[in-house]
Amino acid sequence: MQILLANPRGFCAGVDRAISIVENALAIYGAPIYVRHEVVHNRYVVDSLRKRGAIFIEQISEVPDGAILIFSAHGVSQAVRNEAKSRDLTVFDATCPLVTKVHMEVARASRRGEESILIGHAGHPEVEGTMGQYSNPEGGMFLVESPEDVWTLNVKNEGKLSFMTQTTLSVDDTSDVIDALRKRFPKIVGPRKDDICYATTNRQEAVRALAEQADVVLVVGSKNSSNSNRLAELAQRMGRTAFLIDDAADIQEAWVKDAACVGVTAGASAPDILVQNVIARLREFGGGEAVTLEGREENIVFEVPKELRVDVREVE
């Protein structure tokens, strides 16, 4: 059985930054550090940080006065941000800069009183945070998930209308929704630069190449990870058997026993140690040496806040 690895896969710059913010805050200030929502959607990462003293909460009211609070990589609404400001808290923002870009687009439309449409998945924390940047009662903010949703919209002024997208969507599905928006609202304005982030696009491109060669595709990522789910869906659309797994223990031998080639990738919030564990598990089932496919090189780095720019080793 051949083992192929998608390239790129795993951590993106936004996830690296968010985890570093929590780790550095723990090193500098000590436990406990409060984090609103899971800092990234990965069980292994969250459990590791929890063991070191991070406390994950959903409501600002759960945070005691004087505590350190970190916003997750998915971003928060203005209402949440304002509630935190009203408290005696030290706040660090781990929102991915590419999510912040979308927040700024929505806030700009809100200031102008222009209606906006967000393409995204209802209930996802990134969507809740992005929708929460709009506050102008003269305009309006709408959420759509599919082309069908577009035709149910009732906007006030089709001449002043813009759209944005969640950063972790399927590139193909989003293209279909955008096509529907442009048909329904010919004057609609989109972002100057695509809102779907580089890491989402690159990992979908990589899993497409992987699925062309593999019989079975394993996607390492947690069930609540949007970008990981999209990778599994894409492999399935290409006619491959695909499984979304948290770790190597999830793999059943029956999944791969008849496969000549198994492909492995990882969502943007899944650490490489989980991929290495998957490779080890597949080798127990008769797999050979893992081979990494060619792919796009990623060199993007997002800096942590200056207050947290410290060599963690200096404070240990």
UniProtKB/Swiss-Prot annotation:
It comes from the Bacteria. GO terms for biological process: dimethylallyl diphosphate biosynthetic process; isopentenyl diphosphate biosynthetic process, methylerythritol 4-phosphate pathway; terpenoid biosynthetic process. [4Fe-4S] cluster binds at C12, C96, C197. GO terms for molecular function: 4 iron, 4 sulfur cluster binding; 4-hydroxy-3-methylbut-2-enyl diphosphate reductase activity; metal ion binding. Binds 1 [4Fe-4S] cluster per subunit. The active site is at E126 (proton donor). It is an enzyme of class 1 (oxidoreductase). Its EC number is 1.17.7.4. It catalyses: isopentenyl diphosphate + 2 oxidized [2Fe-2S]-[ferredoxin] + H2O = (2E)-4-hydroxy-3-methylbut-2-enyl diphosphate + 2 reduced [2Fe-2S]-[ferredoxin] + 2 H(+); dimethylallyl diphosphate + 2 oxidized [2Fe-2S]-[ferredoxin] + H2O = (2E)-4-hydroxy-3-methylbut-2-enyl diphosphate + 2 reduced [2Fe-2S]-[ferredoxin] + 2 H(+). It holds the Pfam family LYTB. Keywords: 4Fe-4S, Iron, Iron-sulfur, Isoprene biosynthesis, Metal-binding, Oxidoreductase. The keyword GTP-binding does not apply. Isopentenyl diphosphate binds at H41, H74, H124, S225, S226, N227, S269. Its cofactor is [4Fe-4S] cluster. Dimethylallyl diphosphate binds at H41, H74, H124, S225, S226, N227, S269. InterPro entries: LytB/IspH. Homodimer. Belongs to the IspH family. This is 4-hydroxy-3-methylbut-2-enyl diphosphate reductase. It comes from Salmonella paratyphi A (strain AKU_12601). The lineage of its organism: Bacteria, Pseudomonadati, Pseudomonadota, Gammaproteobacteria, Enterobacterales. The gene is ispH.
